[in-house]
């Protein structure tokens, strides 16, 4: 299998050729400097053979394709993996890449049976249990994160960027969700790293969730984010020039280059916090705004956001912006997040 991968240095092609798994793990060396380990389909680790002393050591996870039709993050990760495999770039920090849902990539759909980004932190085993491939894969991805982070000292910085693109356009093209982390300050350095990636808008979440980034944050104290890099497009239709900042900064991060970050400044980024999550209670749930409304569209107090079960869902704050509206989710799941400005968060 090593020859299959190294013939063209295309880990995405290798993954899609084995969407449901590989027979066994394999590993090999790059030069005298890096141990490469393929743990599963879509799971590849680059492990430097010597500890990098020019910077504090980091443990970096880059994940994509938790939703199979979000292609730009897949292309970003695959390009970096190819540069590592061809030794154009050398990993100085331990780095794990995760291509989340290969069958959904084949299917060109967000998921096959169930939204995988609602299946972490043990949600995969609740209710019906491990009854289909996406639940089984979510559990496996958790296990790979645990294996990776626990393979290095716990006092080293742990980072996890779960890369996505959004279903609809956005007033802020690139934004990131900072998972709920009670008792821990938010990292100004991480916010400025994301800003250097072109991600100039941060949402502070207000409660535990079952997303991949929350799992890494809550279980391993990782600096973890769900990073939205634009709008969903099919393979071949992404304008990759729009992701050059992201590609450059992720490459610098993995390769140990100086990041050259500015000091944290709230004036350089847009900061929001989630004020509430509206879950679907009835099948007739319907939004009161246009289907094409952009993420971060704003509404004023008293406006009708949605109707369901004969009741109106009203804007409660002086102004609320919305992200991720989706009326088609199953009853009980989130239909939209409502946001307010967040000028006074605990950022250090």
Curated annotation (Swiss-Prot):
What does the record note about the cofactor?
A: Binds 1 zinc ion per subunit.
Question: Which ranges does the record mark as transmembrane?
Answer: none
Pathway assignment:
Amino-acid degradation; L-arginine degradation via AST pathway; L-glutamate and succinate from L-arginine: step 5/5
Q: Name any cofactors this protein relies on.
A: Zn(2+)
| EC number(s) stated in the UniProt entry for this protein | 3.5.1.96
A Gene Ontology biological process annotation? arginine catabolic process to glutamate
- Residues in the active site? 228
One Pfam entry name = AstE_AspA_hybrid
Q: Which InterPro entries match?
A: AspA/AstE_fam, AstE_AspA_cat, Aste_AspA_hybrid_dom, SuccinylGlu_desuccinylase
Which catalytic reaction applies to this protein? N-succinyl-L-glutamate + H2O = L-glutamate + succinate
Keyword presence, Zinc: yes
| Magnesium found in the keyword field | no
CDD domains for this protein: M14_ASTE
Q: Kindly list the positions annotated as binding Zn(2+).
A: 67, 70, 164
* Entry GO MF terms: hydrolase activity, acting on ester bonds; succinylglutamate desuccinylase activity; zinc ion binding
Keyword field:
Arginine metabolism, Hydrolase, Metal-binding, Zinc
Which portions of this protein are annotated as coiled-coil regions? none
The cross-references to SUPFAM superfamilies, in alphabetical order and at most eight, read: Zn-dependent exopeptidases
Q: Which PANTHER family does the record associate with it?
A: ASPARTOACYLASE, SUCCINYLGLUTAMATE DESUCCINYLASE
For this chain, the family text in UniProt reads: Belongs to the AspA/AstE family. Succinylglutamate desuccinylase subfamily.
What the protein does comes down to: Transforms N(2)-succinylglutamate into succinate and glutamate.
- Name it: Succinylglutamate desuccinylase
Give the organism's phylogenetic lineage: Bacteria, Pseudomonadati, Pseudomonadota, Gammaproteobacteria, Alteromonadales
């Amino acid at each position: 299998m090593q020859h299959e991968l190294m013939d063209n240095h295309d880990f995405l092609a290798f993954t899609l050729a084995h969407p449901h798994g590989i027979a066994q793990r394999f590993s090999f060396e790059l030069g005298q400097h890096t141990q490469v380990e393929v743990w599963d389909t879509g799971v590849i680790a680059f492990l430097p053979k010597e500890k990098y002393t020019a910077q504090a050591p980091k443990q970096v996870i880059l994940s994509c394709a938790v939703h199979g039709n979000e292609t730009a993050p897949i292309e970003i990760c695959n390009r970096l993996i190819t540069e590592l495999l061809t030794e154009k770039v050398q990993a100085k920090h331990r780095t794990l890449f995760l291509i989340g849902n290969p069958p959904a990539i084949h299917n060109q759909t967000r998921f096959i049976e169930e939204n995988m980004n609602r299946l972490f932190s043990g949600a995969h085993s609740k209710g019906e249990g491990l009854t289909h491939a996406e639940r089984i894969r979510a559990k496996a991805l958790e296990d790979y994160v645990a294996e990776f982070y626990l393979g290095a000292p716990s006092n080293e910085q742990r980072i996890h960027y779960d890369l996505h693109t959004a279903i609809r356009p956005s007033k802020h093209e690139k934004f990131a969700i900072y998972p709920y982390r009670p008792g821990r300050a938010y990292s100004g350095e991480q916010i400025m790293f994301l800003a250097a990636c072109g991600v100039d808008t941060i949402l502070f979440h207000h409660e535990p969730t079952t997303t991949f980034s929350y799992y890494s944050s809550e279980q391993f104290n990782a600096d973890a984010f769900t990073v939205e890099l634009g709008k969903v497009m099919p393979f071949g239709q992404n304008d990759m020039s729009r992701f050059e900042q992201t590609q450059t900064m992720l490459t610098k991060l993995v390769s140990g280059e100086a990041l050259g970050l500015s000091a944290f400044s709230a004036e350089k980024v847009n900061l929001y916090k989630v004020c509430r999550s509206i879950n679907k209670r009835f099948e007739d749930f319907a939004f009161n705004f246009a289907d094409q409304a952009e993420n971060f569209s704003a509404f004023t107090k008293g406006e009708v956001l949605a109707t369901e079960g004969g009741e109106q869902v009203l804007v409660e704050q002086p102004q609320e912006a919305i992200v991720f509206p989706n009326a088609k989710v199953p009853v009980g799941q989130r239909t939209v997040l409502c946001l307010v400005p967040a000028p006074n968060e605990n950022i250090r």
